Amino acid sequence: MDVDISENFIELANQKKSWIAWHVGSTAHGSNIEGFREAVAAAKDNFLHIAHINSYCRGQISNETDEALEAISLLKTHPNIFSESYLSPLNGTRLVVQNDVPISKVTVTCLKKLGYEPTYDGMKKAIFDGAAGVLVDDGVIGKLLSGKGGVEYWESKETKTTGSFKVNPAVSRFLIATAKRSDGSFVGDSFSTDGGCYPRNVIVENGLLLVKFGALNLNEYAVKASLNGARALGLKNKGHL
């Protein structure tokens, strides 16, 4: 989508007092730190929820640390932006291949970053090697398959699947999870997942590791894991642990 269209959506949503969120990227810039800069600028002074900030700090343009610090700086100077980040190394993306090319630019980027060709054979090898996992949901639990079983499942679905790569660097996850404003509030308002779609719901597991490390205390963990998200959604009876 062209950025001017996104700007119009943001303006209209704010006029209507509607919540608006953006998984950044446009026809001009991808889902990376450049796309993040673009989204912040497009919002102007309007409210905008920019989803999963850590996803734009994977070292595609600069290095992971510099990208995370830039994202934090932009959020500090634009309090109109609501944001969250997840704590898992896994991303979520489509693994569909058409005409020997993955249809998702995110998948293409992941394959290249991990040393695989962005082709049918490259995707197949990434799954076989365990660099990518194919999401299998049996109605009870979602899990990632790799190796021979993953390839067989992927091919049985004619590649029409989703899955994950381990492409979220620890440094950007850590920096964004713990960054604070001068008033002590968090730069990234909440921890997040995809609501169970992908097996990366590690808010408790990895969040408590931040507490154990000393980067957060238990009260701060509860604020990021529950309270801020509940407040943002207007859930008055939620937000405690």
Give the predicted meaning of each segment.
Residues 1-159, 166-187:
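Histidine/acidic residue-rich metal-binding segments in metalloenzymes
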Residues 28, 164-165, 193-196:
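Generic alpha-helical structural element
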